[in-house]
Each structure stands twice: as C-alpha cells, then as structure tokens.
A protein has these predicted regions:
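Conserved ankyrin/ankyrin-like repeat signature
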Residues: 12, 44-45, 77-78, 107-111
Length: 118
C-alpha cells in the first residue's frame, strides 16, 4: 500500500481503500498513505485519499503532517487540497508554516496564509 501512495498510483490505491484497507493506514514511522502521497508529490493521490476520508490532521512520530510534507515538496495542488480538507498549517512539531519559513519558501507561506486566513 505504501509504495502505491509513494508512486502515485491513485486508482489502484483507491480501489484497495474502497475494498477495506484503512485509509489512515500508517507505517512503522507513523507516516500515513496521505503523508507519503503528499511528500512524493502526487496531488491526485492526495485528493483521492482525502475523498475517502483520510485525516489531514494525523501526525507521524516526528510530529509532521501531510500538509508539512506537501509544503516541503512545494506542491501547490496538494497544499490547496489539504487546506480545503481542513488541514491546520500551525499543527505539529514541524508545522507547515514553520517549514515554509525555515526553508524560505515564500510562495508556500503565502498560500498557507491566504488559504487559512492566518
């Protein structure tokens, strides 16, 4: 399942989730399918998982969220989808806002601020 998320195989992954695989399945580091899709730059997979109830507020063992991963990878589409699903840019030990600030990603910071009215 995790490789499907990493590789952006949206339709195949969605079929497994529709057949009963937990949409919030985590690996040994606490990374969800949603986090892996966001980190590896697959906004279509992010959208497919969100449509099936993936929780954008889940944190891995480092306190990172899917939104933080999408910001780090500078995926505007994934960031927008996650914000639209209610992701909090201030959540986590390494929040999306902190990540955008630390890595000097002004376009991501603007998107986060505009998207959540912060």
């Amino acid at each position: 399942m995790f490789d499907l998320a990493r590789d952006g195989h949206s339709e195949e992954l969605a079929a497994y989730v529709d057949a009963g695989v937990p949409v919030n399945l985590t690996n040994d580091k606490g990374d969800t399918l949603l986090m892996l899709a966001a980190y590896h730059g697959h906004p279509d997979t992010v959208a497919a998982l969100l449509a099936r109830g993936a929780d954008p507020a889940r944190e891995n063992e480092r306190g990172q969220t899917a939104l933080t991963a999408a910001v780090f990878k500078q995926s505007r589409e994934a960031v927008t989808a996650l914000l639209d699903a209610g992701a909090d840019p201030h959540q986590g030990n390494q929040s999306a806002i902190a990540t955008a600030t630390f890595f000097e990603l002004p376009a991501m910071l603007e998107l986060l601020q505009r998207g959540r009215g912060t």
